[in-house]
Amino acid sequence: MSNASKFFTSLAVQLTYNVPSLRQYICEAVTKRSDIASLSLSEQWRRLVLGPISNLQSESCQSYVLVVDALDECEDDKDVRIILQLLAEARSLTTVRLRVFLTSRPEISIRYSMHHILQAEHQDFILHNVPATVINHDISLFLEYNLGIIRQEWTLGADWPGEVVLRQLVLYACGLFIWAATACRFIREGRRFACKRLDTILKGSSSAITAPEKHLNEIYLAVLEHSIFSGYSEEEKEEAYNMLKHTLGSIVVLLSPLSTSSLSRLLHLSKKEVDQTFEDLYAILDIPEDSTYPVRLHHPSFRDFLLNKDRCGDFWVDNKEAHQILADGCIQLMSETLKKDICEMQAPGSLATQVDSSYVEKCLPSEVQYACLYWVQHLQRSGAPLSDNDRVHQFLQAHILHWLEALSWIRKISDGIIAIHSLEALISVSLLTIYYETLTNLY
């Protein structure tokens, strides 16, 4: 997840499934504070994780490991520091042995935060310092296992793909597991054309001496190019390219993942168009069978690839333009959806905490909640100039109160206040008067 708002609540849910004896204590914590999801990260950690685990009996002598993968994908450096500080408190437990296994790219905020944790409380393991022979051996095992599954599925013969090909693939991977994983998914998605796709990789890959990044570029390009049907006319190919860049560009700059259903509504496309665009992209996208579950990238390196013009050529996505598309989509969706008393309570003063969350989600679907939370951030990142009587001006004039009301229903009114302060740096004096007058009239 790109933000930490659901980090500890997600962890608590997983604990209830994997450690049944914790379920009672976690449920009690939620019962005591029904608004627990809106509390600070430290409160969530202590009420949902640390507190319940401390209630376990010491006689069980159990050891537990919390696995936190890719912490660097959390965009807020402050949240990263808080999470690391809180996780370090795991050592304070006396009734059970709790350890944290954490992976991350070596971003500055991560390294800085780790340096402020006592050396005795953590061990660092730098992947780049692992001998190449060890990594290549592991990649070879990974490839052998996954290609073996493909061999069995399509009865490709006991000697497929063979030791020589396996060694070639290990060389092409250049120590990158993401290359090996993407290659295996690409081959497997080819189904009866699995052998042909393997040949595409072998013929397309440049010399093993080339930098690892180039090999990753080649495998990503192969996946994208195969998603465009070669039998299309030039005009149809152009349309397919544009749709691919439009939808993938949105996926890689989303500030929180969305389902294909929500994404289609946010981009004002039919769900069929989005599904058809993504149907050959399972090698790079994690697309759940349930269309209400969010779509995610298999690896953040694809985001880096797609936003770099030098690496992906015709598939390049302009970062600012992608944010502009999402900002426009958010504003249009909110303008079409938001209204006074959107939850139809017909009772001024109703508290969000007293209304069932499923009812709120029915009135404010995921894509509308996303638009309310992130439209200002997308606007900021687009770098687009604003002026009087433009779409932002018109939206604020018509819907600022409806927007704030929606945020209050999803218990994110503080995000609205932060967004309003952010708008001050973007909009003109005449625009500022709109919401200052509106907010003044509230009191």
Ranges and model annotations:
Residues 171-175, 370, 398:
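DHp/HisKA dimerization-phosphoacceptor four-helix bundle of two-component histidine kinases
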Residues 1-325, 344-346, 352-361, 390-393, ...:
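Conserved NB-ARC/NACHT P-loop NTPase core of NLR-like innate immune receptors
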Residues 329-396, 402:
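Extended alpha-helical scaffolding segments used for macromolecular assembly and cargo binding
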